[in-house]
Every structure is written in C-alpha cells, then in structure tokens.
C-alpha cells in the first residue's frame, strides 16, 4: 500500500483549518429537593424569572423564585419522576404558547399542547404568555355591543366589545351557563364572512372536573359552536402551576385576534381556583402570606391578566378582546378578598343568586346588584329605547314588593306596578341554549313595557312570548329586519310592531 505524505499533510491541514472553536454550552443546574410540584435547583446562575427549564425526563418547569443560593422552579407536570441530584437545563425561552386560527375547534392544555386526540396543532406562531397589557394611547373606549343573547343581560347589564364584565355567584347558580349561552349566541355572527362582525371565543377551564369540561365541549360540538372556539383546560387533577398559567395562555391566544384587527371574547372559568392554585405555589415557594393566606401580589395576578382585555383604536387595527371572568363566592359573600379584588378591576359585574335560581328565575341575575359601568355606550339605540323603561319599572317593583309583604290593602296604582313587575320578571326568564337576537329581544321587551302582558296570568307570559316571536319570524319578518339593519326602533317600525302585537294579544286572549 502506497502512502503519500503530501496527501496526508493536505488532509490534516484541511481538518485543522475547519476545526471550530465553538463548544456546545448549555447551562445546567442540579435538583436539591423536590416535592408538591416545586423543585429547588442549584446552579442556573443566569436563569431569567419566568424562564422555561427542562428536567432530565423531559418535564418542563418555570423559574419563579430567584434566590441567592438556589432557584425555585414550579413543575408543569408530575414531579414523581424527578429525583434529587438530577440535572436541570435552561431553555433560554420565556414560557410561550402557540397562537393563530389553527387553534379554533381544538382543546389544549395549559401550555397549548393538544389534548383532544385530533393531531398536532397548526399554529401561526408562538407568543409569550405573560406580556404587558396595551397602554393608554392604543386603547379606545368601548363602543360596539357584545351580545350574549340573554334578555336580562343585553337589556339591563349590556356588555361591549373590549369590556371586562365579572360573572359572580355561589356554586350551582348558572355562571358557566351564561358563558356557554354567550358562546352559542355568536354562531350567526361567525357564519358571516366579514372579520369585523365575527367574534371568536376562548374558554379556559381552571380546576374543574374533567367530566364537566368534556360535557361543555360536547355541547359546543353539537351546537356547531366549537369551530369558532378554543378550549384551554387545566382541570382539578392538573398540578397547581398548570392551573395558574392556563388563563395567561388562553389570554395570549385571544390577544392574537385582538392584535390582528379581529374580535374575541375570553371566559375565565374561574379565577377563584386560579387564585387558590397561585396561593398554593406561593406558600410552597415560601413567599410571605397576606390576607386569607393569599400572597401580597394576588391583586396584581388578576389585574395584569384582565388589563389585557381592550378595545384598540383605529391606528392599531380596531381589534378587541372582551373578558368575562367568573368568580365563585361562598354563601353570597362578595366582600371576601378575591371577589372584592376582581370587582374593583372589572368594568361591572353580573351578580347571580341562589335564592333566585331556586325560585325558577333563570338566568338568576340580581338586577339590583348587577351593573355594567361602560356597556351602556355600546348598546344599540333600539335596545336603549326599550330597556330604559324596564330598568325603572323593575327597580320600583323590587321596592314595592318588599313593602307589599306587610300590607294587604294596596291602592290601584301599587297593584298595577306589582302586576307589571311580576310579568316583566317572568319575561326576563330564558331557558338554556335558546339565545335571542337583538331585534327579537327588542320586540318582546317592547310588548312587556307597553302593558300587553298586564292582562295575562303570569304563567301565560312564556307562551305569549313564543307565539309573538313565531309570528314575527314568519309573516312579519320585515319588522325584525328593519330593527336589525337600522339598529334603531323608528316610529314607523314601532307603529307596525304595535299593530302586530295588538292583533296577536286579541287573538291570544
């Protein structure tokens, strides 16, 4: 075999020339202790707050506590596989999530991984989950309605696109039912091609039973509403860090629509459980406890999340993100720590009561305690015209009803007021999964406030409403179309409506 020295030296020179000095550097630390979903890690000197780190078995975590001698990491997953002495690697990335229209119709976990068995997610890009809310200049005041399809809410406690409206009440009072009806009510809007009209829905379930979430998804699927919705689920069996991060992940997904000139609504169900998960994490990280053992920054936890809901100005695309946070109270106590915090952050609240629920008033909205601080400027002219009257009459009715319990001899005007009030209360009841369009609500409330329900027995109000609506949808559809297109109840349309209602009232009696 002939070995040529020149060839060998050429190969060696070539190898030396291409020899790189770069070494693969990855910063690693070591697990000091682990338990209850928290790991103490030594090393990782340059880790950032909120950075994603990776354990030996592939489980991920987030660096939350940066102390002098160790880093407190919350673990996004089971901590059973993680042992003392194992290595932890920096990823050099702050926690992010996939965003885009590819997520519509999907169910994902708190980090944006699919959990519905429909294959990988086609995301447009990834965005950080905890970002700064829009400043003052990009914002615009709320001006467009966000219809829920529920008469009691759209007429009396209107919500606008870009608003934050709290839904608060005890357990089993129908809080999630209101959220579900709101999602279902967006179906006709999402069937239209115009992106300005569409309203995408993001629902985040925190600390709920898996069966409840599965049932929710099933209803959306059956009603054809899943195709414009994203479900983010961090159920009761998920670790506290997952329940803490889920609302932020979902908010980022909603922000994609807001920042691209589209509209979205996000429902946090519910933030009480997120606060409990955050309290658990904070106590395990040895942060000092405050009132009700919550950490001192639990207000900031919710304020920085809810401030991300906004209506953007024309220069920034005119998009919006509406937030409907849900809070569960204990025995109607709205003066507890978390409820008062969230009430002060939001632009109004829908207050649900157990007593009303059991009286059969569903949705069980307490109209006296519920307010919408900015929604009235977003209400359509037609709704404003008929709703102003019903508000005053119901307020008088509640006042009189309290006194009427004590005295039996009531004068005629008081009796008339009580009759009208009980029929209007009956009119505001609505079965689940039957949202009404704005123009239909205007017509039935107009009939109620103009005295057409007064001669009827209370138990006939529902039948009257159903009959009137089917008559309007059938032969008199031009009245509904006129209200829908003009968003106003003109004198001409009101006269037509009057003749239809009068004719129907005579035949109904």
Swiss-Prot record:
This is ATP synthase subunit alpha. One of its GO terms (biological process) is proton motive force-driven ATP synthesis. Its EC number is 7.1.2.2. PROSITE patterns: ATPASE_ALPHA_BETA. GO terms for cellular component: plasma membrane; proton-transporting ATP synthase complex. Belongs to the ATPase alpha/beta chains family. F-type ATPases have 2 components, CF(1) - the catalytic core - and CF(0) - the membrane proton channel. CF(1) has five subunits: alpha(3), beta(3), gamma(1), delta(1), epsilon(1). CF(0) has three main subunits: a(1), b(2) and c(9-12). The alpha and beta chains form an alternating ring which encloses part of the gamma chain. CF(1) is attached to CF(0) by a central stalk formed by the gamma and epsilon chains, while a peripheral stalk is formed by the delta and b chains. It is a peripheral membrane protein.
